[in-house]
Amino acid sequence: MTDQRRVLLQQFVLWVDAHIIGDEKGEAQVFLDKFFRAFGHEGFKEAGATCEMRVKKADKGVNFADLVWKPVVLVEMKKRGEDLSKHYSQAFMYWTRLVPNRPHYVILCNFDEFWIYDFNSQMDSPVDKVKLVELPDRFGPLAFMFPQPTEPVFGNHQESVTRQAADRLVMLFRSMTGRGVDREIAQRFTLQSLMALFAEDIGLLEKYFFARLLDDCVTPELAHDLIGQLFLQMDSASRASGGRFKSVPYFNGGLFSMPARVELTSEEVEHLKEAAKFDWSKVRPEIFGAIFEHSMDADDRRAHGAHYTSPVDIMKVVGPTIVDPWHERIEKARTLRDLENLLLKIENFKVLDPACGSGNFLYIAYREIKKLEARIYERMGDYKSIDSSQRPMGFVSTRNFFGMDINPFAIELAKVTMMLAHKLAIDELHIQEQALPLDNLDANFTVGDALLAEDGTQRQWPLVEVIVGNPPFLGAKLLKPKLGSDYMKRLRSAYPEVPGMADFCVYWFRRAEGHLPLCTTDSWEAGRAGLVGTQNIRNNASRVGGLDAICASGTIVEAIDNQPWSGEANVHVSIANWVKTQDDILVPKARKLWFKIASISSGRKARGSGHASKEFDLDMREVSHINASLSDKVDVGAAFTLECNVTPSFTFQGITPGHAAFVLPKGELSSISAEPELVSSYLVGDEILSGVSNRRFLLNFGQRDVLEARRFPKAFAYVQKNVLPARQKAAEEGKDDQGKVRPHHRRFLERWWQLSWGRADMLEQLSKLPRYLVCSRVTKRPIFTFVHGSIHPGDALQVFAFSDDYSFGILQSSAHYEWFHAKCSNMKSDPRYTSESVFDTFPWPQDATPETVNAVVLAGIHLRQVRSLALAHLDGGLRALYKTVDLPGKSPLKDAHAELDAAVRRAYGFGPRQDLLEGLLNLNSKLKDAIDRGDVVQGPGIPASYKEPERLTSTDSFGQV
């Protein structure tokens, strides 16, 4: 097979040599067709690829990509002899917009060379380059092109090199601290060694200088003296007059101001020698820092397992907030004066990351701004009056970048990352700037709390034009346990405008909104921010504290509503990029709203398997506005809570036992069989959806005190044996810093024989009903089911105290479904039914007639009949059944839902094409006004005017005997 492949590829090389002169416009398509044939296809069309595919521009109009083969590759052709490095930005822009099912790889080709990119893992340099003449023997990097693709083999895959290099320095650091070297000295020594390793491979030190020095460190004393002397010389503005270190230049007085001297063991010297064997010019500073930082204290985790934020995810902030507005201005500049003004602006353009970690956002922001600066110079060169030797001496400096973080070591890493960024930009862009001395960034990076100053007031932030970053992902319920009550009191005192139940990151959003300058006609580049937050920033208190305020003073121009985040395990995030203005002249008319979709199935692998890809796909639509829910739909975020929905209570979370021993399999019933009044059937959420029933029973003492509970000796002894020790242990382990048992642990211990949350109020309501409604609390699509009144629901279920078919119809309709999706909170990627935001604000029909009520009832009964008939012949339960709704084509289930939706619209008085959210929001507002006036309104359930409401309750239910 390999020989056959080689023959086809050799024939392609010979054909190109004989027939192609390298004309991009005239020969690209025939070249690409032959290229596909060389890899075993019948041609690019037969493989499913498209030439000249339309790609939307950032503003108006379209570009045309030379070839797109989803989900495999985008190919951009350039004329023979063209410098492919100049076309990276164009290729990345095309790739970004080719959603959904975006190609995994990108190829830039000038008929003689193939530059291969994998932007998911490595952005600014190719993962490999293959010359045309090498193709028969070096097709490994292009192995994804074959009809039966194999894993490509890349020669410049910098992520793996970076992880391996980081691993060596992590082991060095752990070895030093493990044997008692002061932690601060060990950190400083490691960072200074890191700079030396980079320096000898990127031309700041003589090649192999540090490696040869390590060869001579044959004793701990020599290691102390030789390496220490190198660091001392790197801090000296005066070169050594002679000797071994006379070639060492001055680096700066920041990183090396305190040269670290350590007597290294032979094993530690070996770690450094192994590290020196890597080509550090291929180590990526923007991911090295994060990997290194996250590995330092994780004894069970080496660098290869650490998470980092992928550069392509960082560009989802840096691109819209920094690159796009600058790129538009640069390309639209029409005079030399325009370009000179842009140059002056960009050289004074300042960026802040107030939760910078090891500096990866700032590194990529700096790199992209240097590219923009280079593009300004390139365009200035188009004017004959410009003498390149007379260019101004000013340039974008790393001193324009500011960072804050509570972790001192992360700040030191960030400084090193930014120091390296300058030299790497010089090499990448071939610009004439002095690499040394490195900028001293001590004044730019601050160690400490970014939110609170020592006196409890808001921390002062540096004055900048733009703010970027990803603040800590910490949910509201974890703030007190993780940060302490005292800290949270001071934080809420300093930020009274942020609600108490807002996630931690919301404080950064609100602080950024208040700190940013206004975006104006003269300062169009300022007043911009892009932050990553928990996906909950779109919802409830978090939304009120952050995005509501942002939308009140500015405009969200690009957002991602929900995606997995590459930087943390099992975290789903939302991203908002905004401008602090509502002036139509300063914001784009078309805003970009990205949203997660189900991965499109294909015979080809759509995404990489690395952690940065996390198996998801995004799509994008251009919209006229993005609201504080990060949606372009009617904004229901400000809907009012309706008192008629709250009192009396209609909806509850199911029972939370709090310990597995309270839930009994059928086989364990015998141990307490003589005390049946404490036991009831118990239902968990998965049983409803999967159709698989594992009979469980709940042991529940209810509200009985300990003396009453002892009247049931078997059950009491069982709980005393199985539950009490666990609650005693939890109380002990959960003490606060003052040694006090936390309130919830104290409550559980004081009533250890009772369920954690027995929901007595819910059980009282359900005891009056023959059946009740439930749906899963965490669900993409609420599927409502009646449950027999004898069964007690578990905490994975949202419970609704309705037994009638009319209420079922309203809740199962598209009206409630759309309201749910607009108002729910989220757990990871799945929506969560939050009664306070969804049910308590949902307006029920006010003028339903007996005829429209009956129509809803009959349609709801019919829907359940269709479901029941289908389930009799389908494995997998309701979950499997409802997956068929997403498939194309007609089905009885779709028809039944359409019938129900039409009936519910008529009950509301909505037209068939009326926007449901708009109609419901208007009704919500009218009901709030009516309630405030003291008028009688129709709350949840059967309309009060309906005669003989008992006729609206059928008998089918889950668990019915």
Language model segments and positions:
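Preference for the N-terminal adenyl/adenosyl cofactor-binding alpha/beta module
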Residues: 1-18, 132, 137-370, 400-410, ...
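A short, conserved, highly charged catalytic patch centered on acidic carboxylates
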Residues: 1-105, 119-123, 147-148, 152-157, ...
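Glycine- and acidic
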Residues: 12-20, 76-78, 151-158, 173-180, ...
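Signature of N6-adenine DNA methyltransferases within the class I
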Residues: 21, 59-62, 84-86, 98-108, ...
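Flexible phosphate/Mg2+-sensing switch loops adjacent to catalytic phosphate-binding sites
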Residues: 44-49, 209-213, 329-347, 369-399, ...
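Polybasic, glycine- and aromatic-enriched phosphate-binding surface used to engage nucleic acids
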Residues: 79, 96, 506, 593-858, ...
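Conserved residues in the N-terminal Rossmann fold of short-chain dehydrogenase/reductase
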Residues: 108, 398, 403, 442, ...
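Non-catalytic DNA-recognition/assembly elements of restriction-modification systems
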Residues: 356, 711-722, 839-961
